[in-house]
Amino acid sequence: EMQRSLVGSEMCIRDRDIEAFKKAHAQREYGFRPEDNRMAFLDELEKAVFFFDGALVTSGRRNPAWGTTAFTLMELPDKTKPGAWSELYKDKIAQAKIEAGRYEKIVQGIRTAEAEALRNRYTLQVYEQTNNLQNYPVRLILALNAYDTAKDDAAREAALEKVAEVCSYFDVMRSNLESVYSETRFMEQPEGFISDLNHHNHLASKTNNSDWWYYYEIPMVKKVRAWMK
């Protein structure tokens, strides 16, 4: 009897398509009614990863699935050549504008989900902080674009202040993210930790603290701050 029950359950699972699984997950994990589609933002959050993953570099990779490599950061605007930077990175800028809209859509979706969830709100907090992290390169690229295309000195000065704000926001974003993640994860290796000796080039093996989470962002912020001086 138990075997028949297990087989029946397996067949039921096999008969479900991806959308049915999503609805069942939303109902089971958070108590949402399937027809409300409260987890639609998760699809957008997954799409945002693709731009985030390489937004700040022109070569290299940090995808854990493929191993990490050396990388080259984006160049920064030249005050003597206004508009040249924006032309060079026009594709990144265009996508960043799309991602900015996606970010706001995700923010609204998470807010609604947090307000209506019957349980498991912690996971929604993780999604919220992940969204903020993935949006960081978008903020920085658009701020640099505003500086590069400023119409006069006053506008350029205001844009430069915005770039500085985005650099400062990185520390706030990181602190908020790690405050949430640290509820269930260690943020650094213990003293005396011995790194992997199997020669695998894992992203998580790059640092003994959480710096590897921001493999491109930390050096890019450092580069921008030096450029502003």
Predicted region positions:
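Catalytic domains of carbohydrate-active enzymes that cleave complex glycans
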Residues: 17-229
